[in-house]
């Protein structure tokens, strides 16, 4: 491995398995460091493509999303770092795929628990092809003022406190990602800060070792001293001991191996990492610390003394003129996210949508304040749900049963009506369910199913103004307006619409008042004197009876009733009901595998 610097201020990465927060932290670090280009060139989300919006300072940017590693590498040939946030189950396969890409030079594997046999294969391939693996089980790494991997160094506040927005003179490597954050802070307190920091990961077989990075730091001119934080278990530290003995490291090394307390336990102890377990004497923290000290590293007597050892080593280098003071800079402030600012009470922002009928912010959705569990446990019906979501109140059971009756009676009226016909033709053209449904719904209007609202409006206006049926009908005639809710293509005086009869019978039995329906029947009596088919149709029946429901229930003010009729609630009832039938016709045609519909010539009048 050896060589030298693996990151720079122009390094770009590909991020595998989209995670919003780690990517945003990388971009915030970029802005803090004054980078001109974002460090994340592209995102790989298997099976997906498009863009993800994130912030680069104050500016919102779109980062490309690619479905495969190969596609991402081809699209971003200058991105040579692969940050793998895959789970331990797929981390090995995706990492190997990345290593095989000619443009990828460094692979960071975040997942913990990658099978050791898979890790060995990755290590073997990387070494044979002169590539670098950081991890598995790592938080990543950072080059101060230039580039960082994922969540390395934590929050922006911590990064600023540790002075990671500009380079220092210390190269740092550890096994533990959590302890690396602590050490960045320690090093910043007693030196001019780190130049580069790496957490190799706590698994038994790390992709790169402590000595790999120390030897690399030794070749970086800007790194004047190194700090190593090892841990008990394994023999990784001994490769560093050999490098020190052989004179391969010419810069001061301050080292400490944690886990000296393991001797206090009578049996083998497993600490946080897979590789951090007490084994034989050679793997103990005491033995490693002694070996490092004998090889020439500066090893304190305890972890508490590590900070002093780092400080003294750094100050000696300054005295010897090997380190020049770093020019301190003031990093730019990172704009605070709106959500964070609102949560902390720093700003207030207007909302863009008002919703009064449902709320999904709690443990369960609520319809007009009624929890979903209550709706199910108390046996609410579809009519009850409509009363909550449409009328924002729980209507009496006779009202909700009437609503359900309207839905059942209007669900379908055969394949010959315009709505069903359109859905059938569309379905037979091979279109999808939604297209077929909408095709039928778009025929609903003044001539088909959409007269309920108008019937209610005109009947209400006439009744409230005390117009006689004669005055009402003749007045409409003078205006050139057909009376909505009156007339049928098939039904007549002698062939009444059964649906109308059922609705009227229910209302007479359950409604406290049917004044609007009785008025509509009086109008029907007058219109039947003119023509045999001018009967009260289902639109007129529902329209007039809904007026009786609203006024008779005592739960709506006059203003609310006028608003409900004006908005179009009653046509909404027909739209909801007829959707059931239109969906049924669509499924029926598809189930029967009916061919494309073509209207027969003999049913067309061709004329000039």
From Swiss-Prot:
Its main location: cytoplasm. It is found in: Cytoplasm, Cytosol. One of its GO terms (biological process) is fatty acid biosynthetic process. The keyword Manganese does not apply. Its EC number is 2.3.3.8. One of its GO terms (molecular function) is metal ion binding. Pfam families: Citrate_synt, Ligase_CoA. SUPFAM superfamilies: Citrate synthase, NAD(P)-binding Rossmann-fold domains. InterPro entries: Cit_synth/succinyl-CoA_lig_AS, Citrate_synth-like_lrg_a-sub, Citrate_synth-like_sm_a-sub, Citrate_synthase, Citrate_synthase_sf, Citrt_syn/SCS-alpha_CS, NAD(P)-bd_dom_sf, Succ-CoA_synthase_bsu_CS. It catalyses: oxaloacetate + acetyl-CoA + ADP + phosphate = citrate + ATP + CoA. Mg(2+) binds at residue 231. Keywords: Acyltransferase, ATP-binding, Cytoplasm, Lipid biosynthesis, Lipid metabolism, Lyase, Magnesium, Metal-binding, Nucleotide-binding, Transferase. The active site is at 273 (tele-phosphohistidine intermediate). CoA binds at residues 292-302. One of its GO terms (cellular component) is cytosol. ATP binds at residues 214-234, 265-291. The keyword Transferase applies. It comes from the Eukaryota. ATP citrate-lyase is the primary enzyme responsible for the synthesis of cytosolic acetyl-CoA, used for the elongation of fatty acids and biosynthesis of isoprenoids, flavonoids and malonated derivatives. May supply substrate to the cytosolic acetyl-CoA carboxylase, which generates the malonyl-CoA used for the synthesis of a multitude of compounds, including very long chain fatty acids and flavonoids. In contrast to all known animal ACL enzymes having a homomeric structure, plant ACLs are composed of alpha and beta chains. Belongs to the succinate/malate CoA ligase alpha subunit family. Heterooctamer of 4 alpha and 4 beta chains. This is ATP-citrate synthase beta chain protein 1. It comes from Oryza sativa subsp. japonica. The lineage of its organism: Eukaryota, Viridiplantae, Streptophyta, Embryophyta, Tracheophyta. The gene is ACLB-1.
